[in-house]
Regions:
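Core transmembrane alpha-helical segments of multi-pass membrane transporters/permeases
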Residues: 111, 150, 155, 163-180, ...
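Hydrophobic or amphipathic alpha-helical targeting/insertion segments
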Residues: 100-106, 111-113, 121-125, 132-133, ...
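Transmembrane alpha-helix interface/packing and boundary motifs in multi-pass membrane proteins
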Residues: 220-225, 256-265, 297-303, 444, ...
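Membrane-water interface regions at transmembrane-helix termini and the short interhelical loops
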Residues: 31, 58-62, 83-96, 143-158, ...
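Long, contiguous bundles of hydrophobic transmembrane helices that form the permeation core
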Residues: 2-44, 329-429, 532-620, 648-658
Length: 658
């Protein structure tokens, strides 16, 4: 191997090195705060402290009245959004009218907050659907809806904004829609009451989860990453796979999986690990589209990887009424299957391309062992969750522990300025999550009160004649369509409202149903035509976004199959006896292996098309819930592997050994 091919990560990109080793204090949030006017910085700093103290008080001291703490949480999020994203900066023309608009939004948010705080006690005695909305209440409700929708437009997406508009239009003009989805409509005062006071409205369970759980975990994740933990996870993934077949691609899988356990954000994972792994993959011999697809698929898996999954998983626990630890435990096997499939896939692609163990492209980072203690906060968090500690308290204590751990080394020790910046970053992320959870309340309130969910359940039952597979297929397609336009949290919440009752009506448990819907909401991030994680990775790789999207879709095929598998085999989600769970584990691993080999087109040797199809067929047979299908699947798996191994001996010189 020539010296020219020897590559060091330190020469790849200064930003990538900073992300891996946390040597660069001038982070994105630091730059953002540095460039904003001082009055906005100080205002945000004060709001950050107030919001943090409030959140600590309600968990460590005593909870407040729900009509006090929920609106306060919502309004603090709104004001934070207005200050971080002023319209005067977003617009091309710096018209003073935009300042007036921003001031109006801040003032109206404060007015909404004042209304609820001053009427919190009386609202506890208000009878929903009986007491008439006063003029003041209608005005407050209108302002609340306007603020939430404008916040969605600024920090979430225009897609979600237009979806909300569609639901509002349906609420008002439902009586003019022909067919099954026609209903009498909701009067304007009634609609405002539903959205502001209804248990399925803006202050419903999604926002309750944002207040009671998500805020604390988002702040913890920010501190854990900025205190050195994130860098250790990335470096660990890179080191574990260095000097192996397809090492950089495996590094992307491992690093993104490890980082995803903390962040739970596909795009954030791509942006963080992709700047390291994608250039390395390209230099090793992977095509730009392959490199980008591997990174986007691996990063998307972070939302389904315990212990800290996507925000939707916390909301799922709230909806089902179970401990989050149960959700996380149930998600382990599907997550392992997902990452195992991607890991095997990149290995087989490397073998097919003839890439050896020593490609000359190596990662040179700091030693891992001297820094491994920085992972203690995440280890302690997992232990506390398993031991039954409440999620908020666990996150609070582990956040404090992260700061203490960071103080051990001068490299990660947090100055007061960096401490404030990190806290402000965590609060900013909390605000950006609170907004879509509140927005989902608008849509859920309309769906529930218009009877759409019942009608969809009836439609599924009629069209599929009670067929579970048809119901699952319709729900999966609906989730994918929603997930293409909406964030995972919003897609999951709407899909659960629309499809869950129909699936559960066919005898499927709440946990399995919700996990099925959640999975498809997640993989929509890498499903064309709208696949934001894939597009982000394609931008880093300089690859075709369209080709990357389809490549990622094919690489992640396991994620589209596993949800059907755990519906028919609930033992995959730990719903069954010990024997059933062990069998499910073995079956899933075997099916995952065959799927990965079929997609890569390699099993001991390059596969012909009919051999790849045989791998797919046997993998699908494994999903069927019967002893006969297990026997046929195992026999088929053994035959395929034996045949490919024996015939592969003739071509042994075409690929290097593992």
């Amino acid at each position: 191997m020539s010296n020219e091919k020897e590559t060091k990560v330190s020469a790849l990109d200064a930003k990538a090195k900073a992300l891996a080793n946390e040597e660069d204090e001038d982070t994105k949030i630091a730059k953002l705060l540095k460039n904003m006017p001082k009055w906005r910085f100080y205002s945000l700093a004060v709001l950050t402290v107030i919001w943090t103290v409030f959140q600590l008080y309600i968990k460590l001291v005593k909870p407040l009245d729900p009509w006090f703490q929920l609106p306060l949480h919502m309004c603090l999020a709104l004001v934070v959004v207005w200050l971080y994203n002023p319209m005067v900066e977003k617009s091309k023309s710096h018209n003073k009218l935009w300042w007036i608009y921003d001031i109006f939004l801040i003032a109206s948010s404060c007015f909404i907050c004042w209304f609820f705080l001053s009427h919190a006690e009386q609202l506890n005695y208000r009878i929903f659907n009986v007491d008439v909305m006063t003029t003041t209440e209608v005005i407050v409700a209108v302002l609340l809806v306007i603020n939430v929708m404008e916040a969605v437009r600024r920090v979430v997406s225009m897609s979600l904004f237009w979806v909300i508009c569609f639901f509002l239009a349906y609420a008002w003009f439902g009586q003019y829609i022909p067919g099954l989805f026609r209903f009498s409509g909701i009067s304007f005062p009634k609609l405002m009451e539903v959205l502001m006071y209804g248990e399925n409205g803006i202050f419903g369970s999604p926002l309750v989860t944002s207040l009671g759980t998500l805020f604390y975990f988002l702040v913890f994740g920010t501190f854990f990453s900025n205190c050195g933990g994130g860098g250790v996870l990335i470096d660990g993934g890179m080191k574990l796979s260095d000097k192996t077949v397809g090492g950089p691609a495996k590094a992307a899988v491992i690093s993104s999986g490890l980082l995803g356990m903390v962040s739970g954000s596909a795009i954030a994972n791509v942006s963080t690990t992709g700047v390291l792994t994608i250039p390395l993959m390209k230099k090793t011999g992977y095509d730009p589209e392959e490199a980008a697809a591997v990174e986007s698929v691996a990063s998307t898996g972070g939302q389904i990887m315990p212990p800290i999954m996507g925000a939707g998983a916390f909301i799922m626990a709230e909806i089902i009424g179970v401990q989050y630890a149960q959700i996380a435990a149930a998600a382990v096997l599907p997550a392992v299957a997902y990452f195992l499939a991607v890991f095997i896939l990149v290995h087989m692609i490397a073998k097919k391309k003839g890439l050896g163990k020593d490609s000359g492209v190596h990662y040179e980072g700091k030693p891992i062992l001297p820094r491994v203690y920085r992972l203690l906060p995440i280890i302690v968090l997992v232990i506390m969750i398993i031991m039954g500690y409440s999620l908020p308290r666990s996150a609070i204590y582990c956040t404090i522990f992260s700061i203490i751990i960071a103080a051990i080394s001068p490299e990660t020790r947090m100055s007061p300025r960096k401490l404030l910046q990190t806290l402000m970053d965590g609060v900013r992320q909390a605000a950006n999550i609170a907004i879509p959870t509140a927005a989902c309340g608008i849509m859920i309130g309309i769906v529930v009160n218009s009877g759409v969910a019942v009608k969809i359940a009836k439609l599924i039952g009629t069209s599929g004649e009670g067929s579970l597979f048809i119901a699952l297929l319709i729900a999966a397609l609906g989730c994918l369509l929603l997930g293409m336009a909406l964030p995972t949290v919003a897609a999951y919440l709407i899909a659960v409202t629309l499809f869950a009752s129909a699936i559960q009506g066919l005898g499927i448990s709440a946990l399995v149903t919700n996990m099925f819907i959640f999975y498809f909401g997640v993989v929509a991030q890498i499903t064309p035509p709208v696949c934001l994680a894939s597009f982000t990775a394609a931008g880093i790789a300089g690859a075709s976004a369209w080709k990357t999207g389809w490549k990622a879709f094919s690489f992640a095929i396991t994620a589209f199959i596993v949800p059907f598998a755990f519906v028919y085999r609930p033992a995959i989600l730990l719903e069954g006896t010990a024997v059933e769970i062990i069998i499910a584990y073995c079956i899933v691993i075997a099916a995952t292996y065959l799927l990965a080999c079929g997609i890569a087109g390699y099993l001991f040797r390059p596969l012909k098309m009919w051999e790849r199809i045989a791998c797919y067929i046997v993998a699908f047979i494994f999903i069927l819930p019967s002893s006969m299908s297990d026997i046929i699947g195992i026999a088929g798996c053994v035959l395929i592997m034996a045949y490919c191994f024996m015939t592969g001996k003739k071509n042994a010189n075409k690929a290097q050994p593992v």
